[in-house]
Design a protein with these regions (language model features):
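Polyanion-binding loop/helix "lid" in catalytic or ligand-binding cores
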Residues: 36, 179-225
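Metal-dependent phosphoesterases centered on the DNase I-like endonuclease/exonuclease/phosphatase
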Residues: 162-190
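Short, basic/aromatic-enriched C-terminal tail that caps enzymatic domains
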Residues: 229-239
Length: 239
C-alpha cells in the first residue's frame, strides 16, 4: 500500500555539477526536493520505488544497485540507486536520466531507509496503463513510498526547449493543482496528446502515482512551483 509519495522535477540541471554556473538558480528546487524526501523517510516505508519518464529503450524496472551516469552531459559523475542485495552482482543496465537524477537526490539526502529500486515509465504510455502500473507498484509491499520524477511542459517561453505554446501555462497549472491536492481524478484526466505536444515528460509518471494512490487516502501539499528555462517544475508531497 502506498504510504507516502514525493514528486520532484528531473532536469539534469538539478545536479550542480551539470548546471555549473547556473547551479544557484535551482537552489530552491533542490531544497524543496530534500524536504519532500524527508516526508518519505518519516513514513518509514518497506520499499522505495523511484519512477520517472523513460524512452522506449530504457523503460521498465531497475533493481537496487542500478547505476546512472551524467557523462552524456559532460560531467564525470556516476550515481547508484540503492545497494544491490548481498552476494548479487551489480546490475549492468544504466538508469535513464530521470532516474539518475532521482538517485542523485537520494544520495544528497543520504537516504538509508527502505531498499530503493527504479521504474522507467515510457513517456507515451496510455493513462489507463499508467494507472494499472501504479496499482501494481502499491501492492509490492505493505508500506510503499514513491519518488516520482517528472517535468511539466517545456513550452512556457520563447526560449524554452519547445518554444512558446500558449496552452502550456494552463496545462501546467492544472497539473500543479492536482499534484498539490492529491487529486487523483484530475491527474488521470491529463490529456496524453497535449502533454506529448507540450513535451511534458511528467504526465505518465504522475498518472502512475494516481494509480498507486487509489484507496490510500493521502493528502497533498505543494512545496515548490516555477518555470525556469521555460520548463514547468513542481515539488509536492503526499502523505
Amino acid at each position: 500500500m502506498l504510504v507516502a509519495a514525493a514528486v520532484c522535477p528531473c532536469p539534469p540541471l538539478l545536479v550542480p555539477e551539470v548546471a555549473r554556473g547556473a547551479g544557484p538558480e535551482l537552489d530552491a528546487a533542490r531544497s524543496a526536493c530534500l524536504d519532500a524526501l524527508g516526508v518519505l523517510a518519516a513514513a518509514r516505508p518497506d520499499l522505495l520505488i523511484v519512477a520517472g519518464p523513460a524512452g522506449p529503450d530504457d523503460g521498465g524496472p531497475f533493481p537496487p544497485g542500478s547505476f546512472g551516469s551524467f557523462a552524456g552531459f559532460g560531467v564525470d559523475l556516476t550515481v547508484r540507486l540503492g545497494e544491490p542485495p548481498a552476494g548479487s552482482p551489480a546490475p549492468e543496465r544504466p538508469l535513464p536520466a530521470s532516474l539518475a537524477v532521482g538517485a542523485w537526490l537520494l544520495g544528497l539526502a543520504r537516504w538509508d531507509g527502505a531498499p530503493a529500486e527504479g521504474l522507467g515509465v515510457e513517456e507515451t504510455l496510455p493513462a489507463d496503463r499508467c494507472v494499472r502500473v501504479g496499482a501494481d507498484l502499491a501492492a509490492r509491499a505493505e508500506r510503499v513510498a514513491l519518488l516520482v520524477m517528472g517535468d511539466g511542459s517545456a513550452c512556457r517561453t520563447v526560449k524554452a526547449p519547445g518554444y512558446l505554446d500558449e496552452r502550456a501555462a494552463g496545462f501546467d497549472a492544472a497539473a500543479v493543482r492536482a499534484l498539490g491536492s492529491a487529486d487523483l481524478a484530475a491527474l488521470e484526466a491529463l490529456d496524453e496528446s497535449l502533454a506529448y505536444e507540450l513535451k511534458a515528460a511528467g504526465r505518465a509518471p504522475w498518472q502512475v502515482l494516481a494509480g498507486a494512490a487509489r484507496g490510500a487516502g493521502l493528502g497533498g501539499r505543494l512545496l515548490y512551483e516555477d518555470a525556469p528555462y521555460g520548463v514547468g517544475y513542481a515539488v509536492a508531497v503526499w502523505s
